[in-house]
Amino acid sequence: MKRFLSLGAIALAAAALTGCGLLEEDSTDAESEVSGDQVDAAAEAASGDCLPQEVLSEDPDVFTIDCSDPEAYWSITAIDGDTDATAAAGDLTDYQPAFDLCGEEVGAFLPGKPLTDWNMIYDQVSGEVDYLFCVEAIAEPDEEGRTAVVPAAGDCFSSADATWSTVPCDSELADYSVADVVELELTEHAAADLEAAATECGETVYYELTDLFGRTSALLCVE
């Protein structure tokens, strides 16, 4: 039976930053299909193991990669091969198993904190989830100085990036700096409430830190 990798929360939520999704129109199942060897290797995966940014390695024989590999982007924080979770159309039918395994803040954009996400290996036909796992971005800058950490006050970022990260403020990539952060309860907020909170930013531009689940953790007041 074929197994597939979920599209993942971070990939879908990235549209909030750029206005366009990471998923190309010509994406195919082949791009997320997990080989039999990778499924077997996932059985040996454990907290602290690393994965590439795309989660699925190009090498069909391995699931995790060496954490010293320049391609290492995610660190596994938890993995469960005995879950009652089910999937449909590349997504969990109920997110509660992900919250139970990864914590309620998984996928949330929290200022000053590394990106987090969940993912799964599942059977596209039966919907059975073989492995559900949680990941946290490795907070180390890449060759361009980009670090997979949500910007906080004093940080700079590029609005052209596919998802939240920080860049050095003297980098040519930086086009915004965070002047202030308006912290909010991590939940869904009505538009009127967000507009009211945004008055704390004064006349400056602001960004909403809203995740896949519709929860907004804060507003970034930028200049």
Residue map of PLM features:
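Bacterial N-terminal signal peptides that target proteins for export
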Residues: 1-9
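Hydrophobic helical h-region of N-terminal Sec-dependent signal peptides
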Residues: 10-14
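C-terminal motif of bacterial Sec signal peptides marking the signal peptidase cleavage site
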Residues: 16-19
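Primary mode marks residue(s) on the alpha4-beta5-alpha5 output face of response regulator receiver
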Residues: 21-223
